[in-house]
Amino acid sequence: MMSDMEELGGRFVRDVVMKGTNANIMNAMQRCVLALYTYDDNPEDISPENVLRQSLELIAKLPEIAVYSYHAYRHFRKDDTLFIRNPQKGLSLAENILLMLRPDGKYTELEAKVLDIALILHAEHGGGNNSTFTTHVVTSSGTDTYSSTAASIGSLKGPRHGGANLKVQNMFADLKSHVDQDHWDNEDEIITYLKKVLNKEAFDHAGLIYGMGHAVYTLSDPREVILKRFAQALAEEKGMTEEFELYNRVENIAGKLIMEHRKLFKNVCAKVWTSTVDLYTACLVFRKNYYSDLCYCTYAGLECSPLGRTD
């Protein structure tokens, strides 16, 4: 059923996605979602049945919008080659994302499985996070599905929410510039760098080790535990076990450092935005570093869906 809802149509891609490209893909997705309102024959109907239809269509179309917006950004802003590949019926959302994203359209079964699991776990993340709560607040006014979804994508973009995973990736890139690859197994050098981060002497000088700490979970984030296992298998498939071990080492060290620095008496665990999840997905599933711009955009359609209005 979902595969029948995926295609945007050439007119929409040409007239909306490819024109007026944004510097940020999340803003491009907001614009495209609002434009879908004009392609809906019944956009204002907020009955449960119609909202369900609209939400399913958005979930099916947003990965395509994200990938196409990314390609438009790379072409018009970075002068890269532009290629557009249509989704194939019968493939999962994750498989179509990888098919449309990569120049050769190739991916392994494990890559698709890891991305599929990541999409599902993000979609199942309850209704209490910032973007989902935004959906509840905006829909309570009686507005249309497209307006509420666009608002939620705006929330997800923020660096204290979905945008935090880009901070994680940038932080690890900065760490690698300070700790040579030959020393990735040297805990003392990693500790020195992380202490500088906490003391606002390194990275973005915010004093935060991104990807660590959760408002509810202390011992572990169950989503992170699940995805970490698959990320390790993917690292082995791609010959990146050394990098996986670096991320794992930082995770093990950072929690203790944060507890000491802030004088906390509760455990600090890695959360689902940490390197052990989204950074692995970005580096291993998406392969190229510049795909990191797209990483959290792929979750937007699932996390921001206004299905909660039908509760």
Model-derived segments and spans:
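Hydrophobic alpha-helical bundle cores within soluble ligand-binding/oligomerization subdomains
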Residues: 1-311
